[in-house]
């Protein structure tokens, strides 16, 4: 059986906004990541579509981490690194994995402190 893991960090960054996003309650203040099995409950997104297709194929699904928030300033380095590190740690714990489905927003920018 194919084992697939799913994750992503999705954010429309506006680099002209001076404040950076951290890990705070969802909304204009920052990210509130969804982790583990809760990721598998997400739908209505690219990630949800990938998971639905994988489920229809009979694959084993593992949720890692998914985070998104409203368009705003850059992602604080500490927030990005925390989410990245959790994705990597959860992926290591889930191994062996055959496929990783990732929903990342191409306009996401990290690089400031919150």
Regions found by a protein language model. Give the residues of each.
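Active-site histidine-anchored catalytic micro-motif
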Residues: 5-12, 18, 26-29, 75-114
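Low-complexity, highly charged intrinsically disordered N-terminal segments
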Residues: 52, 56-72, 78-79, 83-88
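N-terminal amphipathic/basic leader segments beginning at the initiator methionine
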Residues: 1-57
